[in-house]
């Protein structure tokens, strides 16, 4: 598999995570580290197109994950990315959100480095594991909804955005259930032509 656009240099992992408002695309979830600000803008673009093409979110709200909401807060690379993003007309950039807002659904697309995103993802997985160890499976409608929503194995895998085909990343600790779900997810992505739609959008915007 190759990149959909020569201008889109570093395909990120677009991971769908549950929130209080529905679903959010987090990008990058671990494919890259030490990204520069223009690469984070690419991530925002790819995540926005993915949210639109696959989740059906019109004009998705895009936010940077940061240690504060203020424009001048956080690492220099995040501050630079902020300045770049607020001047991109075709991205609905709403600014920074803090870690406590992630699961509350403060945005439709959450942009961060692959290093940070992978930590966030595994914290969410750890939350589910801890809950399951403390309370087990709760056989009620609410308990079943909780398991269905938060069991990371149900996601199966996450899509590499910006390729000219379907590339799925599965978890290193995936069991049979997770691999089964990953195969189903790959089928859904491929049959819906997600990679092609993303590629067409990216090529037109870059």
List each model region and its residues.
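Glycine-rich phosphate/nucleotide-binding loop
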Residues: 1-27, 105-206
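Glycine-rich phosphate/diphosphate-binding loop of Rossmann-like nucleotide-binding domains
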Residues: 33-99, 108
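Short, glycine-rich nucleotide/cofactor-binding loops
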Residues: 31-41, 169-176
């Amino acid at each position: 598999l190759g990149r959909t656009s020569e201008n889109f240099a570093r395909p990120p992992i677009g991971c769908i995570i549950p929130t209080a408002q529905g679903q959010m695309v987090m990008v990058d979830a671990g494919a890259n580290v030490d990204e520069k600000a223009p690469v984070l803008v690419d991530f925002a673009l790819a995540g926005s197109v993915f949210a639109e093409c696959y989740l059906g979110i019109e004009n998705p709200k895009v936010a940077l994950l940061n240690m504060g909401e203020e424009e001048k807060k956080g690492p220099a690379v995040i501050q630079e990315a902020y300045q770049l993003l607020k001047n991109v007309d075709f991205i609905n950039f709403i600014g920074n959100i803090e870690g406590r807002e992630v699961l509350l659904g403060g945005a439709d697309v959450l942009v961060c480095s692959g290093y940070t995103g992978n930590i966030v993802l595994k914290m969410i997985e750890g939350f589910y594991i801890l809950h399951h160890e403390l309370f087990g499976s709760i056989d009620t409608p609410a308990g079943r909804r909780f398991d269905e929503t938060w069991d990371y194995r149900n996601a199966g895998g996450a899509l590499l955005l910006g390729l000219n085909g379907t590339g799925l990343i599965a978890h290193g600790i995936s069991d049979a259930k997770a691999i089964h779900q990953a195969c189903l997810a790959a089928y859904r992505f491929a049959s819906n032509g997600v990679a092609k739609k993303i590629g067409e959008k990216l090529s037109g915007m870059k």
